[in-house]
Every structure is written in C-alpha cells, then in structure tokens.
A protein has these predicted regions:
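Short, hydrophobic beta-strand segments that form beta-sheet elements in well-ordered domains
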Residues: 118-123, 270-272, 279-281
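Secreted/processed peptides and extracellular or luminal domains of membrane proteins
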Residues: 48, 52-55, 270, 298-303
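A structural signal for short, well-ordered beta-strand segments
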Residues: 34, 38, 140, 174, ...
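Short cysteine clusters
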Residues: 42, 46-49, 264, 284, ...
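Flexible mid-to-C-terminal extensions adjoining Fe-S/redox cofactors in radical SAM and related proteins
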Residues: 2-4, 30-32, 276-361
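Processing junctions and N-termini across compartments
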Residues: 36, 40-43, 258, 286-289
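Conserved alpha-helical substructure of the radical SAM core
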Residues: 2-131, 319-326, 361
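Radical SAM enzyme [4Fe-4S]-AdoMet core and its adjacent flexible, acidic
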Residues: 1, 61-62, 114, 137-271, ...
Length: 361
C-alpha cells in the first residue's frame, strides 16, 4: 500500500477526454460544474470577503442569515444536489468547509465513488484529515493571501504558522488572491512564489486577482497598471518555479477579462448554491454585482483564454460553446429541467450606478 503522499501524486486529473464528457453535459442541458457553500460558519473575518457581503445573495438574506445543515442532513443534501446536476467537477466552499470536516469525511468518498472530481477550498485554520489524501479525485486548495506581513493580518487566526502545521504531510494546492498592498514592495511576487514552491506539501500554486463589486472603493482594489504589471511579471516566474500555474494567455485575460457574465465561460459552466442548498449564487461564484471589467478569478481567466483558441480556421472554442449552450437550453426546456445556469438565457443588462456621495458630519 503506497503512502498517502505517493497516492496523492498518482491522483487522476481532468484530461481532454473529460472535457469531451463536459461538452456532452452541456448538450444535454446540464452545467458541468457545481459550487456549494456547505456552511455559513467561518472563524475568519477577512476584509473584502465576497461570501459575507450584504448583496452576495442578491436582495435576499445574507449568508450568515441562511439556515445551513449539519450531520446526515448536510451529507444527504450535498449528495442529492450532485445527483440532480450530475456535474463533472464540484467545488465545496464556505464559510470554512472544514468546520464540517466530519460530514465531509462522508461526502468526499461518496462523490469520488460517483466519479466526480471535487475541490475543497479552505483556509487550513483546521487540520486537514490525513485519510482525505487517499481519495483519488479530491484536491485541497488552501487560501494564502500574500506573505505573512499581509496574510496573517487579513486572515487570522489562519496564520502562516497554523497553515504550515495543518498541512504537514499532506498534498495541497495554494491559492493566492493578490491585492493592492502586495504590489508596493519590489520582489514581493517572487518571494511568495519561491516560498510556496519550496514546500514539499504543495503540488501547484494558483493565482487570482482581487475582484471588486461594482461601485466598490477599497484598499484591496488593483489599478489597470497593476494588472498590466502582473500580466507581465508573473508568467516568467513559472520557468523558475515549476509549481506555479501561470499560462501567458491566462495572464492576458486579467488585462482583458470577460465584459459580463454572459461573456464569461466559467459563469456559464457552473451552477452555484449557498448554504441552505437551495438559494442560487448569481451571476457567478462571487454573487452580488461583480465588476467584470476588473475580474481576477483564476478559473474565469483560464477559461476566457481557452475560449479564444482556434479549432479550425476562424472557428474558435467560444463558437462551439455558444452553439452547445443554445442546444442545451432547448433540451433543458423540452425536458422541463431547471438545473442549468440562469445566464444560459438572455438577462437584462445591469446599469452601473454612480456611487452616492457621503457627507461627513
């Protein structure tokens, strides 16, 4: 029996044939990705966290106001959603998913047996169970937002010290959301990548940029010049640090992101649920009214780059996706299926209102 570390290195990953299965899902009127906020609870209070924004779930209740589940009800509820949607890939987010680690220890093997690839996104504030490393189709993504000078302030109590302790002997991916303060010190970007590239527990490093809501003005927001610099400076680092996943095309998508959810391939391909397992998170995983012109989502950027790849002559992947979505929408309509994303049908364009002037008293 190989050790958990060896087993992890042999885990299956999404391949070209899986993308063909995904295409088949779309033609059948089903979205190939599913995201579930499995709990409203989180011991962190991170500035700029979209999940706890007042408009994350639109004009309804906030995430903290929803009723969530635990025990058998959570296990059965998540598995039932996966059976309903039949996705190729499931993301389990929060809140902090590891608050429900007992339930996850039942959910994750069940999803693996169904042939579903699963990613758990965690702060690693709670230790990751060692036996999860033996689940073939499971990936753990640990959020580490900057070097300790920023991360330990923003994401306490999930400090560097606690993360390194809780991932010891595991296999994880690192997900980094870059914010404005991290752009101020020369060498910061490479220092971060070099540190995590050197950790034996880390398989890959993913990068996203902070994505604001429309009308937002916050210290985390990046300027257009910042995005251009990141698109220029980060891709060369992948040649020095092999764990960094940073295609040139993905970096360019940060500079020219999708103009709207209708143009975002990730938004079209994913159905997203909040902690009551019935409220939809729209128009994408960010919820609320995200400023797509400043989108920095790593998955959105990667898919936005991919959809521009030529297939044959002037035909691009985007053309095939649009045609497939049109077919899938009709199939879902005739089968009375409501599992597909809302943005598979035309939506009224959101108008960006100017921010209100606040008068100090």
């Amino acid at each position: 029996m190989p050790s958990p570390a060896v087993s992890s290195s042999l885990k299956p990953s999404l391949k070209a044939k899986d993308l063909l299965v995904s295409w088949g899902q779309i033609l059948k009127g089903r979205a190939p990705m599913l995201s579930i906020e499995i709990t409203r609870e989180c011991p962190l209070s991170c500035p700029g966290c979209y999940a706890y924004g007042d408009t994350h779930l639109g004009s309804g209740p906030t995430l903290r106001q929803l009723s969530d589940f635990r025990g058998d009800a959570l296990v059965e509820g998540v598995v039932d959603l996966v059976r309903k949607h039949r996705p190729l890939h499931v993301s389990l987010v929060g809140g902090e998913p590891l608050v429900r680690h007992r339930e996850l220890s039942r959910i994750l093997p069940a999803l693996d047996e169904m042939g579903v690839f699963t990613m758990v996104v965690t702060s690693a504030v709670i230790a990751i169970p060692q036996d999860w490393m033996t689940i073939p189709r499971l990936r753990i993504a640990v959020s580490v937002d900057g070097l300790p000078e920023h991360h330990d302030v923003r994401r306490k109590p999930a400090t560097y010290e606690k993360i390194l302790k809780n991932i010891a002997g595991q296999r994880v991916n690192i997900h980094w959301v870059i914010t404005k303060p991290m752009m101020e010190r020369p060498g910061y970007l490479e220092e971060y990548v070099a540190f995590w590239n050197g950790q034996a527990e880390v398989d890959h490093i993913w990068i996203s940029l902070y994505t604001p809501q429309i009308g937002e003005s916050s210290p985390e927001m990046l300027s257009a010049q910042d995005r251009e610099r990141l698109g220029r400076d980060l891709p060369p680092l992948k040649h020095l640090y092999t764990k960094l996943l940073m295609p040139e095309g993905m970096a360019q998508a940060w500079i020219r992101p999708p103009a709207s959810p209708q143009e975002c391939l990730f938004a079209k391909m994913s159905v997203n649920y909040s902690a009551d397992l019935k409220t939809r998170v729209e128009p994408c995983v960010f919820g609320g009214n995200p400023d797509c012109s400043q989108c920095g989502c790593s998955i959105s950027s990667a898919l936005h780059w991919i959809k521009g790849i030529p297939v044959a002559g002037p035909l691009k992947i985007d053309h095939l996706v649009r045609a497939s979505v049109a077919i899938g929408t009709q199939v879902a309509r005739f089968s009375d299926r409501t599992a597909n994303p809302h943005r598979w049908t035309p939506q009224p364009e959101l108008i960006q209102e100017p921010p209100l002037v606040q008068i100090d008293t």
